[in-house]
Amino acid sequence: MAGRRCPQDSVRPLAVAVAVATLAMSAVACGPKSPDFQSILSTSPTTSAVSTTTEVPVPLWKYLESVGVTGEPVAPSSLTDLTVSIPTPPGWAPMKNPNITPNTEMIAKGESYPTAMLMVFKLHRDFDIAEALKHGTADARLSTNFTELDSSTADFNGFPSSMIQGSYDLHGRRLHTWNRIVFPTGAGQAALPGAAHHHESGQRGRQARFRHRGDHRRIRRRGKVIVRTVGAQLSEQLTRIEFPQCSSHGLA
């Protein structure tokens, strides 16, 4: 994407849109490839990142709240320069859940997993992006019996980003999760999209996508974007977010 970028050490006190998408499905091993998905498949108690550290991870939302950042959920379609959406793959359909906050977009394959969810939040007030990224993986690490597969703090298409994937227990199921947070920065305002992809063990990963409408080279980066993704496979139409598949990473 093209456009001017603000200094990455802070965000101006302008609007920030946050989108979060989640896909849930089962993790399955299919070969001795790297990264080692076999290590995250067991449902027996494991030593998580939380138990091996002296400090409990602080979720991103809690960190932002602690530094005075305020915000509210908004519809993904309300973003102007940046459009974030989840196309519906074959066999998937929109899913309604009364327990999910308004303005949340959610699709599912069947009545449970896998699912993909997209949420957008508008944030206000200056804050340190680099410091915020340190909290981008906390939600995943705090999941029950979470076992990390891999993680990264490399930029995503030139944007500050934090990614983590692994597995955790939920209601008697072992879920694979893939989580990425991205802060696209620029002039004028900030947008923070997040995606999460979950799938239950024993099922084949499916693909969903985030789309930027129009030529992504014409989209000006404004403020920051947080992208959170969990499990399976998500991608953007123009700026792709790849999720593991058996052919390349050991998942069926």
Curated annotation (Swiss-Prot):
It holds the Pfam family Lpp-LpqN. Residues 1-29 form the signal peptide. It is a lipid-anchor. Keywords: Cell membrane, Lipoprotein, Membrane, Palmitate, Signal. It is found in: Cell membrane. The keyword Amino-acid biosynthesis does not apply. Gene3D superfamilies: Mog1/PsbP, alpha/beta/alpha sandwich. A lipid is attached at C30 (N-palmitoyl cysteine). This is Putative lipoprotein LpqT. It comes from Mycobacterium bovis (strain ATCC BAA-935 / AF2122/97).
